[in-house]
Amino acid sequence: MVITVAKELPPAYEPEHIARALKLADVIAARAPAHDRDASFPFENFADLSREGLLALTVPAALGGIGAGARDTARVLGIIGKADPSTALVLSMHYIQHLVMARSTRWPGRLSRKLAKETVEGVALINALRVEPELGSPARGGLPATIARRTATGWRLSGTKIYSTGAPILKWYAVWAKTDEAETRVGLFLVPAGLPGTRIEETWDHLGLRASGSHTVVFDDVVFPLDSEIDVRKPDDWKVPDFTQSTVHAIFVAAIYDGVARAARDWLVTFLQERVPANLGAPLASLPRVQEVVGGIEARLAINARLIESFASDFDDGFQLTAIESNIIKLTVTNNAVKAVEDALQLTSNHGLSRTNPLERHYRDVLCGRVHTPQDDSTRVSAGRLALGV
């Protein structure tokens, strides 16, 4: 591992789960190029993570999990994100759901306990399915087309969800849908994967995060129990963001893409130390211009490390940040990560864009940080409106 000014910030102690993540990182990283090339799903990574107890990282200790907070979870996601961000993204969505379950007064206790038990005992991942072909992301407003119809024997769910990260491995879906009641409600329903009428369409063929399995999930009159409502409310009641959801989503997404930039930085440093052009007679690392650019990368990653560390610690300490503050952290860290990898490409020219080297994969992956909700324009507009009082 390359040690630099912008090294990852370790906690004051090294918990066992951090050591386990570090142990798995090399194995996961070795698999990443093939899964990227083939756009195949890394099932074996999740078997390994389960065996090390890391799928239960954010499950409360009282329910048999590790009970990690945002700080340690961000550290694990940074480690796994550096190895394979597709795996880390699926993992982060699962972690977010369990943190929300543990802190929410709306999640039915019986359901959260059931999912916690399954996660402790095996590979039982969950993710929220929210994005739709027409609606796009619900973060920008609007009601979903996916509809849950109440019957005497259960809910009947119909609709289509796109960009369903982890679709090949998910055991549970938290589906964002509206009801057919006289007064429409909207919210999350817990739906087991694989029920009759459910199908996965393998539509994910992306520039980056190609192994994330973010396919389309279609529900065609899928029947599930009436007591599977997670949190369903009147549409206007959703105007205030969930603090836990918005905060940890920002932290975890930021940590993953910072990890990608660190993987790019490590490869770059080794390349510059070892590359000796014939007309120079010395490593590229000896050039002041190269040192300046690498120093700029170090500065961005050092800022990222401090932001993620302090923000996650604030969350763990009970300090409640606003959604705008959370979103600004995500914007800053992901854009720093993108710029760091762009600068690495600038220094390496054709070598950096060659499929024989990992830098082009890191670049494709890090660009995906900009498309995660909230997008940069929404964050800047919200911050600007608040500052201007409009």
Which sequence ranges carry the predicted segments?
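Register-specific recognition of a single heptad position within extended alpha-helical repeats
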Residues: 8, 12-15, 252, 281, ...
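Generic structural signal for well-ordered, non-transmembrane alpha-helical segments
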Residues: 19, 259, 295, 299-302, ...
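C-terminal helix-coil-helix/basic helical segment that borders enzyme active sites and/or dimer interfaces
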Residues: 33-36, 302-332, 345-353
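Glycine-rich flavin
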Residues: 43-51, 57-160, 165
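A short core secondary-structure module
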Residues: 160-200
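Glycine-rich phosphate/pyrophosphate-binding beta-alpha loops
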Residues: 162-167, 248-252, 369-372
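Glycine-rich beta->alpha junctions and the first turn(s) of the following alpha-helix
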Residues: 206-300
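Glycine-rich phosphate/cofactor-binding loops in nucleotide/flavin-utilizing enzymes
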Residues: 350-390
